[in-house]
From Swiss-Prot:
The keyword Cytoplasm applies. This is tRNA 5-methylaminomethyl-2-thiouridine biosynthesis bifunctional protein MnmC. It catalyses: 5-aminomethyl-2-thiouridine(34) in tRNA + S-adenosyl-L-methionine = 5-methylaminomethyl-2-thiouridine(34) in tRNA + S-adenosyl-L-homocysteine + H(+). Keywords: Cytoplasm, FAD, Flavoprotein, Methyltransferase, Multifunctional enzyme, Oxidoreductase, S-adenosyl-L-methionine, Transferase, tRNA processing. One of its GO terms (cellular component) is cytoplasm. Residues 1-300 are annotated as: tRNA (mnm(5)s(2)U34)-methyltransferase. In the N-terminal section; belongs to the methyltransferase superfamily. tRNA (mnm(5)s(2)U34)-methyltransferase family. In the C-terminal section; belongs to the DAO family.
């Protein structure tokens, strides 16, 4: 059960403010939705041979266009990725308020231009749109800056919500050569607001034959002329949906057949060259951050994943949603026996006072992971493991003066959307926790806890249902070798491969191979204590996070943890760490009677190792060839020219080898989105992260960060 958000804070804008920011496109046209549907059908027909159709939309409006795209998609063998750019972030609560009060989801009569208009029935419900609207609301879009990826129907429909300044959002994305944007819909209230630079950024992201459609151009000849010229100057053909819908029905007022133009067949060569220059500028500016080599086939043996935890399971799932098979190698008898083996793990975002790339990434990642849990729970695979979880919220409190100052900086640093987190006083904290804490805190209403190994197992089961995904248990890969035709995996007795692509997602063993042993990442031991649910303690109703964490009960036990020991010598049970976990709770909430209910006498605990990076970002991307980096460094160091060299030269890497790890203690939040981004890279699809954040995830970043500044390694 999701924790009850602070609803008065959720809807900060009244209805009049909402309709001003998110206006209905054609509320005076009783047939608008029918016209929109006809136009959208023609878009899908024009690109019916593509397995993945990428569409762009400028403006969310009242959401009707988004829902109609979703409803109109009818080809079961085609996937849709719809990228919506909206300057004003909105959350699910405000979106529902907008729909409820505007009656946006109402039935209308079909558009029939040869017949007299019929009166629409304004109060009849549109069940087909209402159902999709509820599905969208259940995904809990939040009012954060950046991209939120929403995946529906086992990957058949994906919606990227890009909130924030449109020019900033467009320019932050890279062109996807294999899967560019094929068509744009621009809502009329944003036509004049788009900067000329935004037009070119749209062109950069588009297929060379991509077109633009909008609504109501013919109603304002001045707007029509200036708008069309702007976009034509970037190589686009611009059409009006009203005219397209009439033409699509075949005959105009004079009885003459009118073809529907949805593909720009003769773009200007000079303008196309200018687009290509923009793309090359991007490539050159981020040459130090090489992308994955795109998979050339979907054969079952094309990709191997080493690891049996959350990272490997979610990579397999993200690949499977794209129809891509994979073979997963796990050294244990069951999945999720490493860092993913805990009974309960907290899921909530890592926030910083500055809301920097780290903070924004973790908000996106946390929300993505939360939606994954919901999707795997609501539409499980056949015989799928159920995922024990409870989105009961996470309550963060301070445990000393220093941590209080840090928490205050976070709370006061940004106007955080209250669906992400909001401050509570001591009385509110007690009410949320259902036990006495008697101190203020920061509450994450959408957070909670998830069972990691069940989460991993459910993801694998779903992946195996969707594509040719296999899992080899009890298979300890001891060495990997690069050969002319791919990567070969070796155990004591067996040999697997070759594989065109190999992903190392093996948690604590991430650095065990020659090709990965130089990664700048450290193992940290963590002992989680399991204590019986009894007396006052059993009433705990949210995850507590202070000096350590404490979960609500699950199957009669609470999880209390965790120790944090760098480069551990062993993974045996440690009585001292057990007592340290208890003392952390006493330091966090001193002199409270419920602390006496924490019974450690059973010495019940689990020990695991999490791999941690210094900057707290996961590692995701091409495996760096560190010896080659160091060799090149001998020739290019500590000069202005050397900085230019490292900036514009693709960094050395191991061809076909990728890293997915370093999830640290927040892998439940960060792992699924990191896996989704790597799957998108491997398949040549748009990635739901901006270019700067991708650089922060790159496994080579520790070396390149210094080299780009002209510093010594």
């Amino acid at each position: 059960m999701t924790a009850e958000p602070n609803k008065p804070c959720q809807i900060k804008r009244d209805y009049q403010q909402l309709i001003n920011l998110y206006p209905a496109t054609a509320d005076t046209d009783a047939h608008y939705l029918s016209k929109l549907s006809i136009y959208q059908q023609r878009v899908f027909e024009a690109h019916s041979q593509q397995k993945l159709l990428i569409l762009g939309q400028i403006g969310l409006g009242n959401g009707l266009e988004l829902l109609s795209w979703w409803r109109t998609q009818a080809n079961p063998s085609q996937r849709l990725l719809l990228k919506v750019f909206e300057p004003n972030p909105i959350n699910a609560y405000e979106l529902k308020s907008l729909w409820d009060q505007s009656l946006a989801l109402v039935k209308e009569t079909p558009f029939e231009p040869h017949l007299e208009s019929k009166q629409a029935s304004a109060l009849e419900c549109k069940p087909e749109l209402s159902q999709l609207a509820q599905t969208l609301l259940d995904a809990e879009p939040t009012a954060i800056i950046g991209c939120q990826r929403l995946i529906f129907d086992d990957g058949r429909t994906t919606i990227d919500l890009h909130f924030g300044d449109i020019q900033t959002q467009l320019s932050s994305l890279s062109h996807s050569p294999m899967h560019p944007v094929q068509h744009w819909l621009i809502l009329p209230h944003l036509l004049q607001a788009l900067h000329h630079q935004s037009h070119w950024q749209m062109a950069k992201l588009s297929d060379d034959s991509a077109t633009i459609a909008t609504i109501g151009l013919s109603e304002s000849s001045g707007l029509s002329e200036t708008t069309v010229k702007r976009f034509q100057a970037c190589g686009f053909t611009v059409s009006d949906i009203n005219e397209l819908a009439t033409k699509a029905l075949g005959i105009n007022a004079l009885g003459i057949h009118q073809p529907v133009t949805l593909i720009n067949h003769q773009p200007d060569a000079v303008l196309l060259h200018e687009r290509q220059v923009l793309r090359q500028q991007d490539v050159k500016a981020y040459a130090f951050n090489p992308m994955a080599a795109i998979l050339s086939s979907a054969t079952p043996s094309s990709i191997a994943i080493i690891g049996g935890g959350l990272a490997s399971a979610h990579l397999a799932l993200s690949l499977a949603e794209r129809g891509q098979g994979a073979q997963v190698f796990c050294k244990d008898a069951e999945l999720g026996q490493g860092a993913s083996g805990n009974r309960q793990g907290a899921i909530y975002p890592l926030l910083t006072p500055e809301n920097d790339e780290l903070s924004r990434f973790f908000q996106q990642a946390f929300l993505f992971s939360r939606r994954r849990v919901q999707a795997l729970t609501s539409a499980p695979a056949v015989n799928q493991t159920s995922i024990s979880h409870d989105f009961c919220g996470v309550l963060q409190t301070a445990h000393d003066e220093r941590s209080q100052l840090r928490l205050d900086k976070i709370i006061q640093g940004q106007p955080w959307p209250s669906e992400i987190a909001y401050a509570v006083d001591a009385e509110q904290a007690n009410a949320i926790a259902k036990i006495n804490l008697d101190k203020p805190g920061f509450f994450y209403p959408l957070g909670g806890w998830v069972c990691p190994f069940e989460y991993a197992d459910a993801a694998i089961q779903k992946a195996m249902q969707l594509a040719d995904v296999s899992v080899s248990l009890n298979t300890d890969i001891l060495a990997i070798e690069r050969q002319a035709d791919g990567w070969v995996l070796l155990t004591e007795k067996e040999r697997f491969g070759p594989f065109a692509q190999l992903v190392l997602a093996n948690g604590a063993e991430l650095t065990q191979f020659d090709a990965s042993n130089k990664l700048q990442i450290s193992p940290f031991r963590g002992q989680v204590s399991h204590v019986p649910a009894q007396f006052q303690l059993s009433q705990l109703a949210t995850v507590l996070c202070a000096n350590g964490y404490l979960t609500p009960s699950h199957q009669g036990l609470h999880c209390l943890g965790a120790s944090y020991v760098k480069e551990p010598e062993h993974l045996d049970f440690c009585p001292q760490e057990q007592q340290e976990n208890l003392m952390k709770m006493h330091e966090s909430y001193p002199d409270h009677s419920w602390l006496e209910d924490i019974d450690m006498s059973g010495n019940n605990a689990r020990v695991g190792v999490r791999m941690v990076t210094r900057d707290h970002f996961p590692m995701m991307g091409c495996a760096p060839d560190v010896p080659k980096i160091l060799k090149d460094y001998e020739q290019h160091q500590l000069t202005k020219e050397s900085r230019h060299y490292w900036q514009t030269t693709p960094a050395p890497l191991h061809q076909g080898l990728y890293i997915l790890g370093g999830l640290g203690s927040r892998g439940l939040s960060s792992g699924p989105l990191a896996a989704e981004c790597l799957a998108a890279q491997l398949c040549g699809e748009p990635i739901p992260l901006d270019k700067e954040t991708l650089c922060k995830l790159n496994p080579n970043r520790m070396w390149l960060r210094k080299l780009l500044k002209g510093k010594a390694l």
